[in-house]
């Protein structure tokens, strides 16, 4: 199998071009780079600079003020090593070596008025782009969700900006190979705008053809992961690839910091799916019954998202 991660132009997909190649990519890989989608490095820089300044210079009181008191509520600031994807996926107990700022369509926690203005604009651009690419996924697979495409895409998205600082020696690859554990996304599509490590190390990797492959930064290109919801709503026509964030070796620690702006196009809480189909597709679903809602699934999946100790 060809393990190359392809690049598609959203504008060309919208013109009906490259449909056979796009369908093969959705079926076999479930990830691709996307250009011409209205998201560039310039928009990312404005939002990134603001949140990195808050991460580095915000006081403890300011950070507490925008930290959600509800562990499963993905809003506001989340401190370094406060979450564990490994715990969520039952693959270990190590923390995610990152800090995070999260926002959605409502109930947000903003550090300032300027932050709210810039981040709301950035969120809206991400939401527009994610819906546009999701339309192409649905069109390419001949999928018409219950209630229609536009109702399905008028949903409950989530934006999470992760800052992965330079790792300490005890989190180097020799000690702990991963900054974040392998997982698939509970989304229709996930859009990622990343910045590279200064030393050239590629941290983000995804499973392609049975092995994890590097997903480097590409200027003015967005990385798209199809999520488990895409698999389910298309009846299994779309792959939801596992991906993780690798740790650098000791000799790569210097210059290993990076950022990743991750936009999850998630369905509404009452989106209903087939539990047997989810299991058949390889998803870890412990719910009873023939059908379940997205809220049922995500509620159980993220019950352990916030770490309670450094153990």
From Swiss-Prot:
Under catalytic activity, the entry for this protein gives: penicillin N + 2-oxoglutarate + O2 = deacetoxycephalosporin C + succinate + CO2 + H2O
The UniProt record lists the keyword Iron: yes
Q: Which Pfam families match?
A: 2OG-FeII_Oxy
UniProt xrefs under InterPro entries? IPNS-like_FE2OG_OXY (IPR044861), IPNS-like_sf (IPR027443), Iron_ascorbate_oxido_reductase (IPR050231), Isopenicillin-N_synth_CS (IPR002057), Oxoglu/Fe-dep_dioxygenase_dom (IPR005123)
E.C. number: 1.14.20.1
**PROSITE patterns, per the entry:** FE2OG_OXY, IPNS_2
Q: Which GO terms describe its biological process?
A: antibiotic biosynthetic process
Q: Fe2OG dioxygenase domain: which residues?
A: 154-267
What are the recorded GO MF terms, alphabetically? Answer: deacetoxycephalosporin-C synthase activity; iron ion binding; L-ascorbic acid binding
Q: Which cofactor does it need?
A: Fe cation; L-ascorbate
Question: Highest taxon of the source?
Answer: Bacteria
* This protein's UniProt keywords: Antibiotic biosynthesis, Iron, Oxidoreductase, Vitamin C
Record's family?
Answer: Belongs to the iron/ascorbate-dependent oxidoreductase family.
Function text: Catalyzes the step from penicillin N to deacetoxy-cephalosporin C.
Q: Which PANTHER family match?
A: 2-OXOGLUTARATE (2OG) AND FE(II)-DEPENDENT OXYGENASE SUPERFAMILY PROTEIN-RELATED
Q: What is this protein called?
A: Deacetoxycephalosporin C synthase
Query: Which organism's genome codes for this protein?
Result: Streptomyces clavuligerus
Q: List the taxonomic lineage.
A: Bacteria, Bacillati, Actinomycetota, Actinomycetes, Kitasatosporales
């Amino acid at each position: 199998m060809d393990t190359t991660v392809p690049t598609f132009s959203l504008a060309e997909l919208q013109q009906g071009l490259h449909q056979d190649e796009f369908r093969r990519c959705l079926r076999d890989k479930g990830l691709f780079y996307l250009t011409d989608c209205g998201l560039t490095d310039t928009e990312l820089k404005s939002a990134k600079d603001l949140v990195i300044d808050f991460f580095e210079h915000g006081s403890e009181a300011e950070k507490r003020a925008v930290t959600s008191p509800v562990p499963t509520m993905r809003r506001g600031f989340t401190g370094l090593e406060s979450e564990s994807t490994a715990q969520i996926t039952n693959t270990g107990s190590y923390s995610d070596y990152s800090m995070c700022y999260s926002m959605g369509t409502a109930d947000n926690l903003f550090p300032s008025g300027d932050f709210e203005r810039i981040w709301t604009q950035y969120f809206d651009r991400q939401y527009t782009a994610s819906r546009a690419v999701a339309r192409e996924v649905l069109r390419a697979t001949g999928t018409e969700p219950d209630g229609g495409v536009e109702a399905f895409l008028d949903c409950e998205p989530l934006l999470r900006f992760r800052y992965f600082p330079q790792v300490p020696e005890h989190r180097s690859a020799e000690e702990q190979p991963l900054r974040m554990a392998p997982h698939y996304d509970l989304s229709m599509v996930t859009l990622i705008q990343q910045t590279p490590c200064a030393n050239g190390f590629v941290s983000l990797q995804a499973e392609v053809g049975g092995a994890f492959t590097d997903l480097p930064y590409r200027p003015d290109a967005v990385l798209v992961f199809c999520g488990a919801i895409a698999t389910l709503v298309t009846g299994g026509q779309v792959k939801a690839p596992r991906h993780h964030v690798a740790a650098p070796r000791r000799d790569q620690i210097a210059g290993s910091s990076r950022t990743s702006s991750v936009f999850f196009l998630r369905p509404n809480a009452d989106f209903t799916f087939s539990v047997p189909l989810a299991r058949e597709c390889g998803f870890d679903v412990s719910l009873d019954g023939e059908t379940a809602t997205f809220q049922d699934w995500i509620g159980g999946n993220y019950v352990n998202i916030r770490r309670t100790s450094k153990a």
